[in-house]
């Protein structure tokens, strides 16, 4: 065989290359060389003209631009960062962070904000996976055969299918999930869904990002301080939170807090990049966090580290509970006409039970106790009914969970638990950064209640501390006015329950989980979960649209339904059987779009006019549309406008007018959809819709539209806070008015509520916050590895996961992390291709050694597209999910279905797998 010279394996070729390189370098240095640097004249007088400097001009021209504008990158990110974009010849060339945020006194500033994913957006948006034109499927679903069509063709087909489906099968068989994370974008899809009576799934539950346990304690559960408030803390618990990786724009506040004297504690099964910066790392065993939290509560109560006066006023802990049936003592217990929402406390001064002010049924809407001195503990006689207090019940039920008793379960030594509890009891400002991961475990519901109990016992909730879950957003009345339609509520559902039915996830979970093991651990199996789901729907607690409707027309805007759910292939196959027209709206061809019937190209972040509101900063950020939509893209608002116009046009052409919708006491005026959507043309244009939102929002108001486009951001006013005013001179902290102004909480008792006497909570032994079961992962024990899919440094969900620069900063392909000792046992080396599998499915990825992981754990960072995997598998192919019955409850004061608040969260980190070399 002829040998090719200069090949990588040819030693002579390498030597010849090096010899040539050295000769060239020497030649360049020689005075007679044409490469001689003597030709480049030094500048001695900057006012004079020098020849032979054209090479510098060429370089300078690379950095010239025609115009600039502002954008933010927030598809799935809870931050909010202003970037200035430089445009040349109508093309975005680069962008840089804005560093003009005003500084508050006494805390570090927010300048600049951003991360590497935002920095590459101009480059990423030019890659071939970004959509240019509307597409229609011409092959089988998933075959990836398309033809280009016009917007009119696309809108006509979609509009006719919506009308046909509604007329023939009734309203509610159109489903419109959306999560575009921009105000008028989101409002547009909501408004259209409301006008046509469509189903609006809660996608936060789909991704497992709800905090339903905390929602039983306070309303809302999902809220945070502005991130600069971290600096004011002296003890910060990063509980299943990895902010060094996932909160890059804000991680500096943690470092600055440490310089200010704060302690950082990392609680996570793995030793991660945030652990490096912590003063204490607790490697809690997966699925046992509630036991650790219970042990901390145990110590705080036993050592009397709680603030009694705070608990008496701000919580339901002094409320009276009957000893005979475990129910709250209510007004109706003494008066048949009394309220079921008025409760009692024991007044130590008068020695009798008195009505507690501030509850849902109370006429006294205040937490002020006046001369009443509530008892925290004791057993009393209330007119012949024996009662005790919630605190007494809590103390008794938490007593078994000592640090010594929980040691074997959690893996955390008692001395470490007591050390941490001591720090908590003595600190002045506790901050709990509560990550998403814990909520994706069955253990997460009760653990959430226990975490907020820790903060509450020491009196820091609403005072000096906070438990930060995830952003809730600011109060923007204009946003609600644009997205809502009076008398047209649409249909909200839990996406978890919808996919449980439509995707037949119940059948999949039943096949995967070991029924005997499950019953031994939690007391019931998947069959009971399904029965309880049906009972909840029959009781009217959870919406039942998934049980009586089908997603015949499914318009998926800004999310990837299959990639963000369990059992990728299983869900897709079963879901699509019910779906006759599957439409995807996105700015890039994600893996879910490969199975679509029609794909609509949405404008990129660079091409849209919109704003992003998130309560992690005190600013609203602009999608300032530095360039107009390129190719045949349209903004999301114009897509909604165009579809509404076509629905009205086709309805009039076909003689279809009003369709009654008695199930939700509403109607659909098909022949007026466009007129109603645009408010008779008033908000047809993007700029009109955005101005409408901003000028009708008290926290923004007149002039804010011009300012946000001029600066890239605009500050919010005091009324923006959902649980209290936004102060002008310090960071925002939620729930302060409940303490300072004695405003009741939006709970049944009007307090931070830790006792739920609902029948189901009594049935499952969960009236007070305590571990729901013995702890540990619930997946089949025959698979040796616990499987987890944490957030990544190199993307925001799927955002930037295909960018060439982000891929070059990692392995360039999907990987899984394993402890080196586990790899050695399996005969796997770093870089090997491996197969991860269980009875639910399989996927293939590159093995990556990760010493910070426990030996029984396997991580695969999420966000990867299906088409990046061998055999088109996916990291969610192996997951299976469970439903916690406590999350199915409704009809109990504040504990009821709420999109983005309370409904079944996706519990899919109970999965176990095995791994082998591929």
From Swiss-Prot:
PANTHER family associated with the record: OXIDOREDUCTASE YYAE-RELATED, TRIMETHYLAMINE-N-OXIDE REDUCTASE
InterPro entries referenced in this protein's UniProt entry, alphabetically: Asp_de-COase-like_dom_sf, DMSO_Rdtase_II_Mopterin_su, MoPterin_dinucl-bd_dom, Mopterin_OxRdtase, Mopterin_OxRdtase_4Fe-4S_dom, Prok_Mopterin_Oxidored, TAT_signal
Activity regulation annotation text: Enzyme isolated from cells grown in a tungstate rich environment shows a 20-fold reduction in selenate reductase activity. Inhibited by O(2).
EC numbers, comma separated: 1.97.1.9
Species: Thauera selenatis
EC main group: oxidoreductase
Pfam families: Molybdopterin, Molydop_binding
Protein name: Selenate reductase subunit alpha
Transmembrane feature ranges: none
Practical applications: Has potential use in bioremediation of waste sites contaminated with selenate, such as agricultural drainage waters.
UniProt subcellular location: Periplasm
Domain 4Fe-4S Mo/W bis-MGD-type: 66-129
One GO term describing the cellular component: periplasmic space
Gene3D superfamilies in UniProt: 3.40.50.12440, ADC-like domains, Dimethylsulfoxide Reductase, domain 2
Temperature dependence: Optimum temperature is 65 degrees Celsius (with reduced methyl viologen as the electron donor). Full activity is maintained up to 60 degrees Celsius, with activity falling to 25% at 70 degrees Celsius. Substituting tungsten for molybdenum at the active site of SerA decreases the overall stability of the SerABC complex, rendering the components less thermostable.
Name of the gene this protein is made from: serA
Annotated cofactor note: Binds 1 [4Fe-4S] cluster. Binds 1 molybdenum-bis(molybdopterin guanine dinucleotide) (Mo-bis-MGD) cofactor per subunit. Can also use tungsten, with much lower level of activity.
Chain sites annotated for binding [4Fe-4S] cluster: 73, 77, 81, 115
Signal peptide: 1-36
Subunit structure: Heterotrimer of alpha (SerA), beta (SerB) and gamma (SerC) subunits.
């Amino acid at each position: 065989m002829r040998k090719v010279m200069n090949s990588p394996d040819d030693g002579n070729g390498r030597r010849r290359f090096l010899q040539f390189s050295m000769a060239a370098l020497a030649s360049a240095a020689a005075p007679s060389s044409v490469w001689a640097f003597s030709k480049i004249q030094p500048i001695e007088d900057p006012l004079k003209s020098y020849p032979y400097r054209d090479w510098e001009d060429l370089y300078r021209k690379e950095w010239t631009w025609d115009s600039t504008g502002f954008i933010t990158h927030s598809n799935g990110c809870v931050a909010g960062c202003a970037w200035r974009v430089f445009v040349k010849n109508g093309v975005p060339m680069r962008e840089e962070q804005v560093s003009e945020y005003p500084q508050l006194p006494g805390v570090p500033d927010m300048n600049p904000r951003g991360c590497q994913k935002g920095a590459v957006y101009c480059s990423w948006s030019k890659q071939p996976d970004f959509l240019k034109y509307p597409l229609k499927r011409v092959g089988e679903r998933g075959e990836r055969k398309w033809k280009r069509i016009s917007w009119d063709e696309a809108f006509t087909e979609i509009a006719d299918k919506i009308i046909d489906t509604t007329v023939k099968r009734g309203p509610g068989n159109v489903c419109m999930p959306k999560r575009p994370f921009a105000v008028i974008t989101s409002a547009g899809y909501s408004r259209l869904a409301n006008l046509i009576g469509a189903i609006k799934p809660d996608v936060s539950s789909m991704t497992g990002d709800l905090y339903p346990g905390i929602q039983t304690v306070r309303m809302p559960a999902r809220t945070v301080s502005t991130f600069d408030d971290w600096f004011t803390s002296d003890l910060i618990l990063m509980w299943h939170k990895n902010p060094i990786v996932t909160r890059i724009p804000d991680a500096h506040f943690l470092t600055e807090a440490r310089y200010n004297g704060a302690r950082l504690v990392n609680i996570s099964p793995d030793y991660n990049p945030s652990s490096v910066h912590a003063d204490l790392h607790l490697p809690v065993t997966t699925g046992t966090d509630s036991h650790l939290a219970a042990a901390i509560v145990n110590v705080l109560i036993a050592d009397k580290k709680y603030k009694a006066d705070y608990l008496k006023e701000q919580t339901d802990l002094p409320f009276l509970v009957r000893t005979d049936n475990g129910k709250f003592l209510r007004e109706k217990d003494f008066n048949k006409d009394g309220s079921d929402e008025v409760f009692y406390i024991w007044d130590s001064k008068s020695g009798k039970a008195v009505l507690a002010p501030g509850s849902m049924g109370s006429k006294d809407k205040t937490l002020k106790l006046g001369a009443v001195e509530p008892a925290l503990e004791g057993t009393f006689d209330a007119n012949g009914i024996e009662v005790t207090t919630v605190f007494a019940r809590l103390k008794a039920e938490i007593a078994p969970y000592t640090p010594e008793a929980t040691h074997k379960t959690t893996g955390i030594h008692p001395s470490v638990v007591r050390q941490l509890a001591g720090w908590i009891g003595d600190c002045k400002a506790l901050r709990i950064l509560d990550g998403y991961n814990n909520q994706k475990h069955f253990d997460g519901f009760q653990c959430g209640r226990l975490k907020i109990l820790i903060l509450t016992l020491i009196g820091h909730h609403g005072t000096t501390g906070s438990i930060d879950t995830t952003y809730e957003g600011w109060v923007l009345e204009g946003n609600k006015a644009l997205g809502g339609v009076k008398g047209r509520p649409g249909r909200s559902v839990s996406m978890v329950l919808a996919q449980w039915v439509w995707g037949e996830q119940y059948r999949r979970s039943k096949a995967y989980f070991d029924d005997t093991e499950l019953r031994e651990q939690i007391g019931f199996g998947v069959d009971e979960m399904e029965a309880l789901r049906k009972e909840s729907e029959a009781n009217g607690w959870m919406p039942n649209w998934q049980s009586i409707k089908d997603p015949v027309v499914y318009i998926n805007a800004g999310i990837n339904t299959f990639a963000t759910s369990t059992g990728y292939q299983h869900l897709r196959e079963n879901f699509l059987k019910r779906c006759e027209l599957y439409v995807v709206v996105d700015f890039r061809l994600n893996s879910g779009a490969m199975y679509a019937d029609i794909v609509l190209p949405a404008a990129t972040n660079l091409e849209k006019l919109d704003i992003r509101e998130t309560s992690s900063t005190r600013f609203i950020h602009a999608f300032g549309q530095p360039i107009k939509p390129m190719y045949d893209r349209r903004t999301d608002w114009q897509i909604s406008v165009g579809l509404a116009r076509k629905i009205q046009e086709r309805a009039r052409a076909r003689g279809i007018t009003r369709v009654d919708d008695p199930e939700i006491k509403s109607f659909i005026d098909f022949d007026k959809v466009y007129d109603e959507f645009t408010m008779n043309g008033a908000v047809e244009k993007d700029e009109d819709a955005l101005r409408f939102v901003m000028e009708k929002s008290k926290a923004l108001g007149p002039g804010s539209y011009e300012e946000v486009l001029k600066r890239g951001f605009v500050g919010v006013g005091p009324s923006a806070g959902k649980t209290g005013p936004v102060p002008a001179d310090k960071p925002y902290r939620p729930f302060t008015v409940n303490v300072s102004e004695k405003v009741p909480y939006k709970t049944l008792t009007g307090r931070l509520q830790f006792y739920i006497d609902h029948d189901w909570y009594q049935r499952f032994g969960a009236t007070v916050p305590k571990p729901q079961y013995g702890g540990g992962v619930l997946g089949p024990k025959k698979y040796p590895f616990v499987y987890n899919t944490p957030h990544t440094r190199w993307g925001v969900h799927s955002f930037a996961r295909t960018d060439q620069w982000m891929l070059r900063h990692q392995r360039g392909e999907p990987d899984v992390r394993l402890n080196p000792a586990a790899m050695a046992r399996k005969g796997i080396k770093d870089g090997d291709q491996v197969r991860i599998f269980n009875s639910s499915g399989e996927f293939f990825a590159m093995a990556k050694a990760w010493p910070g992981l426990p030996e029984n754990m396997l991580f695969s960072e999420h966000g990867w597209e299906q088409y990046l995997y061998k055999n088109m598998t996916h990291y969610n192919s192996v997951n299976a999910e469970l439903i916690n019955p406590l999350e199915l409850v409704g009809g109990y004061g504040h504990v009821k279905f709420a999109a983005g608040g309370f409904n079944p969260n996706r519990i899919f980190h109970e999965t176990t797998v095995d791994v082998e070399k591929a």
